[in-house]
Each structure stands twice: as C-alpha cells, then as structure tokens.
C-alpha cells in the first residue's frame, strides 16, 4: 500500500510541476507535448508496474538456459537422457519465435525415477511460481478423470479449459500425470491443439507446452538398461535412439498407457518420447544427500547409507535397480 501511495503522490507532484512549466509556454503546444509524454510513459511503465503486484504471462521472455541446465544437473540423478533432451527441447522451442506447433513431451519410466520432479523443474524455470503459477496446469488422471463412463464430459471440459487458458496466455504449460491410468480416448480431445495449425477457432496454440507423465514403457526401458549392464556397458552409453522407437510403438500398443492407439502418436504429434532409466544404489544415495541438504541438515554418510540399504532392489539375483526409485526417500529419512 505504501508503494501505491508513493506512486500516486509522485504522479500528483509531476502533474503540478508540469502545470507550472506549461505556464511559460504556448498552452496548446505544451498541452499536446505533455499529453504525449504522459501517454508514452504510462504505456511503457504500466505493464512493469502492474506485474510487480500480480503474475503476468511473459510469452516472449527468454529462457535462462544456464539456470535450467544447472537445475537439471544438480537436482536430477541418473537421468542423462532426460537432462539432455529436456534442455535441448525447451531451449530450441523457446528460442524459435516461429514454432509451427506446441512443444509436446512424453516422459516414461517407473515411479520414483524423476518424471514429476523434472516437470516441476521445467515449470519453475518457465514461471517463478512453478506449479503454483496461474499459467501452469496439472492434471492427475485418477483425480480429474476417474470415471470411464464420463469420457465425453471429460473431453469437453478439457477442451474448454485448454482453450480458455491458452487464449489468456499463449505460453501456458499443461502437465498430465498418471497417463497410464487415463482412460483411452480422453487425451485425443486435445489433438487439434497439438497439430500444425496456425490457429484453431481464432486461437494459436503454437507457444504452449504439453507434458505427459507415464509409467508405461518402464519395463522396456529397464530391459534396455539391463542389457547394457549385462554387456558390461555404462548406462551413460544408452542413447535416445536405443529407446525412443521402442517406446513410441510400445506405448501405442499398450491398452493401459492412456495413449493406446492415440492419434497423437499416429500423427507424430509428440515431439519427444523421453525415457527415465531405473535408479541404482548410488543414485538413491544421491537422492538422500539432496534431501538432507534441502532440509538444512548436514549430510551424514552413515544415515545416507542406512536409508539406501533399507530400499529394495531388482532383479532378484543382481539387485541393481531400486524398485521405487527415490520415491520413498523423504519418508524413510524421517525415521533417522
């Protein structure tokens, strides 16, 4: 309130001074000049002033690539493919002012491997409020689309929600969690918004971002990771080309993927299928350390080892990968 009062006072003072100065010149000319300057100043400063007090949609604000890269490298563990592809995809999309379609990413892997976490990182790098932003929209299948008999209702509601929010902010972000629990057919309602149209009913969707999160394909990803491990090869040697084709076909043919026989895949509207590899023992320890730092506690390696040792690993013989990733690290750390 003090800032607004100060602003009002300074405006009144400026008007008073302008009136005194105007008295020394020809009234009409000075009046026009003052009016023009006032209009220009108001036009240039109003938006910045307004956005100090409320969240604004900055569609053309450049992405801080260095900050995103640092966040991905320091906060996401064991996911070299996801880090590389997300950074490349977001940077390229935001730097391209003439994108032909919205950016559409499909993230796949077992629970606890970092899919939700990376969507949070992306949201925070696009909008300071992250997932709490008015321009970031999170849908959870079991919460927002629970009933199979209401598919048509959900499709209509989804279209209206996306249409309304993109018309308000062209660079809105839409995140769909638990795609593997989404009833097939619902997601096809947004197909027109993801296609190569300049506009749909007068609205352009070309600056929007759509992110799908799914456990579907986790078995295919794990098989590839295991094959590399058993061949004595490092997981960092796994490339996107080793997994993306298998993922897209596997998800398309999986009745429990939410993208089963979806036009989004059939029409190649998903830009990247991003695999999240199963996490190893060393990655779980990294998660524990990160959680301890986030809580403001000193890292105790005995506690780190103790928490990691409590996790269960698979396959039965090799015991390489955590079956819950880092998902239960927070709750387990509470008991130490």
Swiss-Prot record:
* A single GO BP: nuclear membrane organization
Q: How would you describe the post-translational modification of this protein?
A: N-glycosylated.
Keywords for the protein's UniProt record, in alphabetical order: ATP-binding, Chaperone, Endoplasmic reticulum, Glycoprotein, Hydrolase, Membrane, Nucleotide-binding, Nucleus, Signal
Gene Ontology MF annotations? ATP binding; ATP hydrolysis activity; identical protein binding
- Signal sequence span per UniProt? 1-24
Q: In which tissues is it expressed?
A: Highly expressed in liver and muscle; lower expression levels are observed in brain (at protein level).
Which class of enzymes does this protein belong to? Answer: hydrolase
Enumerate the glycosylated residues. Answer: 64, 165
Known catalytic reactions: ATP + H2O = ADP + phosphate + H(+)
Where in the cell does this protein reside?
Endoplasmic reticulum lumen; Nucleus membrane
GO CC list: cytoplasm; endoplasmic reticulum; endoplasmic reticulum lumen; nuclear envelope; nuclear membrane
Residues the entry annotates as binding ATP: 109-116
EC numbers listed for it are 3.6.4.-
Query: Any idea what job this protein has?
Result: May serve as a molecular chaperone assisting in the proper folding of secreted and/or membrane proteins. Plays a role in non-neural cells nuclear envelope and endoplasmic reticulum integrity. May have a redundant function with TOR1A in non-neural tissues.
| Family membership | Belongs to the ClpA/ClpB family. Torsin subfamily.
Q: How is the subunit organization of this protein annotated in UniProt?
A: Homohexamer. Interacts with TOR1A; the interaction may be specific of neural tissues. Interacts with TOR1AIP1; TOR1AIP1 is required for TOR1B location on the nuclear membrane. Interacts (ATP-bound) with TOR1AIP2; important for endoplasmic reticulum integrity.
User: Know the name of this protein?
Assistant: Torsin-1B
Per the UniProt record, the source organism is Mus musculus (Mouse)
């Amino acid at each position: 309130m003090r800032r607004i009062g100060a602003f009002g006072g300074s405006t009144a003072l400026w008007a008073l001074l302008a009136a005194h100065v105007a008295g020394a010149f020809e009234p009409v000319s000075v009046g026009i000049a003052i009016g023009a300057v006032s209009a220009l100043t108001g036009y240039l400063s109003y938006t910045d002033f307004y956005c100090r007090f409320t969240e604004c949609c900055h569609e053309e604000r450049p992405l801080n690539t260095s900050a995103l890269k640092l966040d991905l490298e320091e906060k996401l563990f064991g996911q070299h493919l996801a880090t590389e592809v997300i950074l490349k995809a977001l940077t390229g999309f935001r730097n391209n002012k003439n994108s032909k379609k919205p950016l559409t990413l499909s993230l796949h892997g077992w629970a606890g491997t970092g899919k939700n976490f990376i969507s949070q990182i992306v949201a925070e790098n696009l909008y300071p409020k992250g997932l709490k932003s008015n321009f970031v929209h999170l849908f959870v299948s079991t919460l927002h689309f629970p009933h199979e008999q209401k598919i048509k209702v959900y499709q209509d509601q989804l279209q209206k929600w996306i249409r309304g929010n993109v018309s308000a902010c062209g660079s809105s972000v839409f995140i769909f969690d638990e795609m593997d629990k989404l009833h097939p057919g619902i997601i096809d309602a947004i197909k027109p918004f993801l296609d190569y149209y300049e506009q749909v009913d007068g609205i352009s969707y070309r600056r929007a971002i759509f992110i799908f999160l799914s456990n579907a394909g986790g078995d295919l990803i794990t098989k590839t990771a295991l094959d590399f491990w058993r061949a004595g090869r490092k997981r960092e040697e796994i490339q996107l080309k080793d997994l993306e084709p298998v993922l897209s076909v596997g998800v398309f043919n999986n009745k429990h993927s939410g993208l089963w026989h979806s036009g989004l895949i059939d029409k190649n509207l998903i830009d990247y299928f991003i695999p999240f590899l199963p996490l190893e023992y060393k990655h779980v320890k990294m998660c524990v350390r990160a959680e301890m730092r986030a809580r403001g506690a000193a890292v105790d390696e005995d506690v780190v080892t103790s928490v990691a040792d409590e996790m269960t690993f698979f396959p039965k013989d090799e015991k390489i990968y955590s079956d819950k990733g880092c998902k239960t690290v927070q709750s387990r750390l509470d008991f130490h």
